[in-house]
């Protein structure tokens, strides 16, 4: 069936995609003809050779509507097959889809099924891959039918043994052959039903290694039994030849040809095949034929997967040729290069410059770029307005850039948002929509407040522009992606558009007050008078003054006097006066300014937060624009600059240094006299110098004037920090050597005084290590994000309420005594599952099934509640994705989540994006063996991959009382349970014991310090505890680095890691022991068996690392495009898997709309009923999919 015959709609309207083994008949059916010659194109005429790899008769004409010999040219002969050359007159595009085939003279095995791990062919035949290899590559005979002889079926015979057997029993007494033919016969006579029964019987009695192998064999046998595949199809009789335009040959300038590697590989196969045919016709001696067959087998192996077995076939310059498998694999393969990410039309890129005059939702687009991007729209408009008569002349107008084109362009872009994207796009805020404004020059102008989200600066960064074309796309861009609507960060719900640098500095400068400046103590009758006085220079901007304020209340005009500064008045002008910073219910505060404090970065964040909660995005973005304008203006007027003279070295520095020198001398003396050890001396010296550095820094900070520009920059949070000021004007302090150990000679100088050579040299260690770390970290973090996206990409909010009755109990997360995450943070935006009651009075604070906003959550914590049961993603019952109630609040909008939101991707981005901020280093604890605890990024990876951690803690499997015992050789901890049974644990030296003698511990508690293996927690405490452990451990790493991530993102990923059940006993079900099954499928199967009164299957929740979990997904397309492409496809093909296309990746690959947001089935199939007779409310008939 060819494309032309298919109605167009069908191509994009399929429910699922199935993969399977191709039978020889199927391959011949696909093919348009046999490729018989290895020739490609004629070197003189440059036309394809007949019957060759580029033959026009098989694959279609090279030029549109023109046959090979030239008898038929032009469209009018469409569909005619030329009687001279046999080429069909049609479009040359068919050369991208028509296939050919090669009839092999001898069958060969398909390397994927013979060489993959585990070898599928080996399993189904119950032969080891090594013996199989001997047969396939003509090293041994295999007995096909022993008949009456004492030989065994499938027994291997070497050349010598074979000849001896022939002499002994005679030529006809038994059947033994070699090569793929023999294997094909063995495969063809397998009775799958019978074999399946036998294996199931064997499974009941076998144990250990044997059981594992039986299960593996059964898995392969069942795959073949349940699919329509036949085992003998793993041996190839016919090879498909892919269309020539997918393995092109192009002429280079020098007249030479460049060709795809596949052509070389096909040529080798055809050459060897033809030679083999000839040899068989001639009746050549067996040994020659056998050699040729082996070479054909190797040629086919190289074509399918070069380098999988033996040395790869190389091209010029010893480069291995790219085989069909390599075309799919890796970052440059078909999946990741062309299917998941494509280059698109209507896009451009350019350097970005700052546009402080823009509104929050605007961006500046260079004129010539805009004209090129909106060309078709401009052309259409020109024709409509009558400036051009037809589309051709309007195209000419645009290309010649006539003056009237610009007015039309203005009109076209006025309501047409564009998308701006900066690579690397680490989270969804890396692509936002803006209303374009035409600008001169060639640079894109960007609003300064969106820089944080893009992580952009103006030192030469580039950005890409994309144009949403359809009306729907424009609407989505405007409502969902407009920069003014994306004020909150999806990862933690805090504002991402907080003003930075100059804007903070200006606001800080405005809200400062100063004693004894011009105009202090003056009283003004209204704010306008203050502004007049300030503008005429009568008062200073920081002067403390009094002003009479008036406002209207209940229709009456009331007034009152407040004390403030002109700066604060100006700043408050841009802020709504009811954000809740001032308690307005108190009459004294009636006229008080809303922002009556010093504005720093932190406070600005609070202002934006409150404004967003109260007024929403639009109002907030206007406020931000006002703050931006004021900030820039007054930081310029304030003329806050930085110079060497601003760095004042504290007078007490020299005294502090000499004091420390004396103290260190004392410590040295004690060491020399043997009072303290080398380690102790080192520790004390380091401690002394650390203290001194701290003292110098404090002296410096006390010394600085409040109006010192450097102090202002650091204090306001505009730029720099206390530690940087310390280095500029205090002393640099202690540095580490390349191994991470601290050098005990501190750097005494500050940058202001200048470093000497030794000091400078010591400084370089840290700097270099920092650079190396950053480079490594970026790659690691990127790879972590990729795995996270892959594991959680199909988690979409698919229903309103899954009806789950189980909750997840949360309390604050602590590390030692330090609270890492408060209860309020964990409750905000969640649903309660039961009544939350006050522990003292027993009154209900929050009824069951109530959505808790920040205020409610805070109220719960204030009432002294310690633990709360909430709806959580962990306990969600939705089979695919999650439900809105278990998920709770959408962090990016601070409202309840909508159905169709792709929360999986957002979760992965929220965890991955801050990855680069986490450290790489392992903390060394004073050289104690086995106590290196991993932190930062490697720790996060360790947790998500569910690996056995470094610095493993020993945990107890039973609850009981502790008894410590120390011998010369080792330390032992005994745990005596309630029955008096003693379980002992050996503790290696160097581990620190956490428990004390006689203390009571529960199962799963740590005996020594370190990280616990999550698999142990799962085994001892169960799935609930392990989820909790993973969540709080990842949170600890991020929080210690000052990165806030909301729990729900981690919950989404951890849930994906614990979705599978490992089957123990299969009972009366079809499930095989040892296999992984989805939790919901497992329950479904058991429910069916239960109704029939059979024996249910048993199994335990398995904890998979994110890589494993991503590969264990139902969708083979998603798994194959992630990692281990060949393995995934081999497996899927044998099982005849069908991909239900539920996730995002699968749909991107096949080019459908993703099933999230407006792409969900329920929105795609909306029909408008025009029948007015029906009820008016039910105008839109939403088809629930």
From Swiss-Prot:
EC number of this enzyme: 2.7.7.6
Where do the annotations place Zn(2+) 1 binding? 67, 69, 82, 85
Q: Which InterPro entries match?
A: DNA-dir_RpoC_beta_prime, DNA-dir_RpoC_beta_prime_bact, RNA_pol_asu, RNA_pol_N, RNA_pol_Rpb1_1, RNA_pol_Rpb1_3, RNA_pol_Rpb1_3_sf, RNA_pol_Rpb1_4
SMART domains noted in UniProt: RPOLA_N
Provide the function of this protein.
Answer: DNA-dependent RNA polymerase catalyzes the transcription of DNA into RNA using the four ribonucleoside triphosphates as substrates.
Please report a single Pfam family linked to this protein: RNA_pol_Rpb1_2
Keyword list, A-Z: DNA-directed RNA polymerase, Magnesium, Metal-binding, Nucleotidyltransferase, Transcription, Transferase, Zinc
- Cystines in this chain: none
Q: Which family does it belong to?
A: Belongs to the RNA polymerase beta' chain family.
Q: Which GO MF terms are attached to this record?
A: DNA binding; DNA-directed RNA polymerase activity; magnesium ion binding; zinc ion binding
Q: Reaction(s) catalyzed by this protein?
A: RNA(n) + a ribonucleoside 5'-triphosphate = RNA(n+1) + diphosphate
What organism is the protein native to?
Answer: Clostridium novyi (strain NT)
Tell me which cofactor or cofactors this protein depends on.
Answer: Mg(2+); Zn(2+)
Naming one, the record's GO cellular component terms include:
DNA-directed RNA polymerase complex
Q: How is the cofactor bound?
A: Binds 1 Mg(2+) ion per subunit.
NCBIfam families per the UniProt record, alphabetical: PRK14906.1 (NF011498), rpoC_TIGR (TIGR02386)
SUBUNIT field: The RNAP catalytic core consists of 2 alpha, 1 beta, 1 beta' and 1 omega subunit. When a sigma factor is associated with the core the holoenzyme is formed, which can initiate transcription.
Q: Name one GO biological process term.
A: DNA-templated transcription
Per UniProt, where does Zn(2+) 2 bind? 802, 876, 883, 886
Which residues make up the binding site for Mg(2+)? 457, 459, 461
| Protein name per the record | DNA-directed RNA polymerase subunit beta'
